[in-house]
Amino acid sequence: MSLQFSNGSRHVCLRSGAGSVRPLNGGAGFAGSSACGGSVAGSEFSCALGGGLGSVPGGSHAGGALGNAACIGFAGSEGGLLSGNEKVTMQNLNDRLASYLDNVRALEEANAELERKIKGWYEKYGPGSCRGLDHDYSRYHLTIEDLKNKIISSTTTNANVILQIDNARLAADDFRLKYENELTLHQNVEADINGLRRVLDELTLCRTDQELQYESLSEEMTYLKKNHEEEMKALQCAAGGNVNVEMNAAPGVDLAVLLNNMRAEYEALAEQNRKDAEAWFNEKSASLQQQISHDSGAATFARSQLTEMRRTLQTLEIQLQSLMATKHSLECSLTETESNYCTQLAQIQAQIGALEEQLHQVRTETEGQKLEYEHLLDVKVHLEKEIETYCRLIDGDGNSCSKSKGFGSGSPGNSSKDLSKTTLVKTVVEELDQRGKVLSSRIHSIEEKTSKMTNGKTEQRVPF
């Protein structure tokens, strides 16, 4: 709400308000109220204020009412927007409530001032006043009400827009915070995935190596079996030929027993080879299993070291940021200190320049006073000589007369001859600092005049 006074002052209320100015029969009335309300991120806040003043025929009364109510609630799902900032939000709401109350007090004072002016205007220009002005403003009541309603609606709309902007800003801040948290988690998960991918690649290489070794061992076993079968066939063929020969040569030899013995011998040899191959395979498999377990332990240890190093890196980054902030603050302090000392140095130099100027002026004045004093001294000596000449001319019988003005002294008539001597003693006093620079200088001059006559001696000292 905006009010324009005759003296050019202006009061503005940014919250919804209503006011009316209505002339009555022999009196005046004014009422105003303001209300504001809104919700921020699942919480509510409302305040209501009101005040009024009026006068009736035959008397006047003034009254004001201030009511305020604050209702603060928090609601939300999935943590809400105030999951970790309740204290900050409460502080912000308290600050806003304090600002609203200050605005209300200012509005009450402005309303009281306006009511006093309206009352004075009606007392001065209203019906029954000394000027006898009797105007009927009833035809403007509808226009006033319409404008008042428009002002109320505009103020309410403005307040709603402001609250929506605040809500949108808070929501944007909350989404930004969530985005930053999710981004951090995403980066950590990606780092873990990359580490697991490296471990998976290593395990894949190990598995491929094991498969190659298994294939080579399988081929070797197949080759050994094939060789064994070929040897068995060759031995069986050789044994069969011998049997035929022996049967022809010596039919009394038992070939079945011989074949059984050879079969048992080769079966034992094959069983021994199989056991040796199986033992060698088991040994190789055990060594490979141990190597795989060792590699898994090394990968786990490397993963733990990587996690620890990542934590150390984050800690060092935080320390680096804190050190950078400390460095920036120290640089700002250094710059501020340098600027302060430069300012003080400039002030001291200005004071030194002013003192040097004053010293130069004092020296100039001192030299001028010295020249003036010397001129006056010469005039004085000249006058004394003229006076002595006049005395000698007046007293022709040989008496002498001496007379001096100012600082001089004389003795009458005992001498016809006057011998005078003037001595000027100058003393220079200088003040030096620790570096030997002259801070100030003063000159003291003392003039000693000695007059010799026939019957006496007169000494005269004139300080300067």
UniProtKB/Swiss-Prot annotation:
Head: annotated segments: 1-85
Localization in the cell: Cytoplasm
Region spans: Linker 1: 122-143
Region of interest (Disordered), residue spans: 443-464
Pfam family, one: Filament
Keyword presence, Cytoplasm: yes
GO molecular function terms attached to this record: structural molecule activity
Keywords: Coiled coil, Cytoplasm, Intermediate filament, Keratin
Tissue: Strongly expressed in skin and scalp, and weak expression observed in thymus. In the hair follicle, expressed in Henle layer, Huxley layer and in the irs cuticle. Expression extends from the bulb region up to the point of differentiation into the three layers. Also present in the medulla of beard hair (at protein level).
GO biological process, one term: hair follicle morphogenesis
Region (Coil 1B): 144-235
Chain residue ranges for the region called Coil 2: 259-397
Residue span, IF rod domain: 86-401
This protein's record includes keyword Cytoplasm: yes
InterPro entries: IF_rod_dom, Keratin_I
Region annotated Coil 1A, chain positions: 86-121
One GO location term (cellular component): intermediate filament
Residue segments, region Linker 12: 236-258
Region of interest (Tail), ranges: 398-464
Family classification: Belongs to the intermediate filament family.
UniProt miscellaneous comment: There are two types of cytoskeletal and microfibrillar keratin: I (acidic; 40-55 kDa) and II (neutral to basic; 56-70 kDa).
Subunit structure of this chain's protein: Heterotetramer of two type I and two type II keratins.
Annotated function: Essential for the proper assembly of types I and II keratin protein complexes and the formation of keratin intermediate filaments in the inner root sheath (irs).
Protein name: Keratin, type I cytoskeletal 28
